[in-house]
C-alpha cells in the first residue's frame, strides 16, 4: 500500500485495519525487557545544534568562530559524559541544552534575543521517547534555564505546556532559579534589535540607515537529541525566539511535534529555523511518521520534511537520531552550528556547509 495513502487515511480519523493490511508490528514484538533493550543498544549517541541561518565564514572572525566551536564542544561534552555513565537520554539532552543556555553566543537563556519592546521571552521543550511524555514552556521572562523548567512541567505538573506568569509561579514553587531581566542583556543582541529597528524605519520612509540584516540577527535556537544505553531516545530544544518579535509570540521550539519530538519507535528530533513554517509543517512528528508508516530511513525522512519546509518558504535545519544510533543533520541555509559524537566516541563540531 502506498505510504502516503496510509498517512492520509491515518490522519482522517481512527480506522481499523486487519493486521496484514498495514503490516504493522504487533505490540508484543515492540515490547522488550530492560535486559533485552540493553543488549540491543550497547552504543549511545548524541547530536546537538546551536541554530541554523546565514552563517558565512567571511562574516565571522577567527576569534568568534573559536568561541562558537568551544561552546559547541562544551555542550556536546556535557551530554556525552552523562551517556557514558549509563544515565538517561533525558539527562543528557537537558545538560547539553543548559550549557547552551548559559552561553551568551547562542540564542537561548543568557543569549536570548530581544522582543520589539526590548524584553526577553524564552521558550523550551523536552520529550521522552520511551513514554511520549513531554514538557514545554513559553513566554518566560525570568527563568535562567528554561529547559529545566520544561522538564519539571513534564515530571511534576500534570500538564504538557505552561507559559508566562503561571509557568514562572510553578518554577518558584519548585526551586527553579529565576533571574532579573537584566541578566539576559548582551550588547550583541541589543545591537541586533537596533539594526532591525533602523532597517524598518528606513523601509517606511522615516529615514535611518539601511543596515544588512542576517538570519543570525533575527533568530536562532539550540537543541539536543540523544540515544542512551537503555535504548531510549530524548529531544530538548530552547530558544529566545526571533529578534523584534511581538511580545507573546511563540515559535516551534516548545510545540511538541513541531520543533521538538521523540519516540523510541522511530527517532528524536530538534529543529531550528523559521518557526512559523516549522509549526505548519509539523516537522518533528512528520520525520517520525515517514519512518514509521512509510519505512523511510532517518536521513530520507529528515530531508523530505526539510524539503517540505522549503516549499512553504521556510529556512532552517534539524538534528535527529534514531533507535539504532543513525543521525541526520540536514539544513537549507549557509550554515548550522552543530556537533555529534562519532562511532569512535570522538566529539565532532561543524559550522559551515
Where on the chain are the PLM-derived regions?
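Bacterial N-terminal signal peptides
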Residues: 2-14
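Alpha/propeptide regions of enzymes that mature by internal proteolysis
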Residues: 20-353
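N-terminal low-complexity/intrinsically disordered extensions
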Residues: 1, 19-20
